[in-house]
Amino acid sequence: MHRGAANEHLPRTQFGTEIDPVGFRNTLRAIYGRYRLPLLITENGIGAFDKLEADGTINDQYRIDYLRAHIHQMQLAITDGVEILGYTPWSAIDLISTHQGCSKRYGLIYVNRDEFDLKDLRRIKKKSAYWYGEMIKRNGLTDAV
């Protein structure tokens, strides 16, 4: 069972979850220190109310900031000696939240639908999808990414 106290010094998502990249690094170090096995990080990301703009884009800079900060801390954990097998964001495509349905979005790719209307179900790359693709092409974070 996990218990904790809220940290008023940390920023929070639209849904009240703390954003703690340094805590992510500390957790990676603690798990690796205990088990001494390589780690595979899956579903690291942020849920938000993403909005399809009139020009057909989704500007999710908050997701880019979140991913950049967490990936940077993961790189520092690797420098600390933590073995990382791989990393995947949460998630490639929007999915249905068990609590907020279709309004809470997680993916790098937007699905054009809402709670009450399937609309055209188009898949639209968010700004974060382009950013993540560039990061992969460069094999990691750089000043440009």
Q: Which functions belong to the PLM regions below?
A:
Residues 1-145:
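Non-catalytic scaffold segments within catalytic domains of secreted glycoside hydrolases
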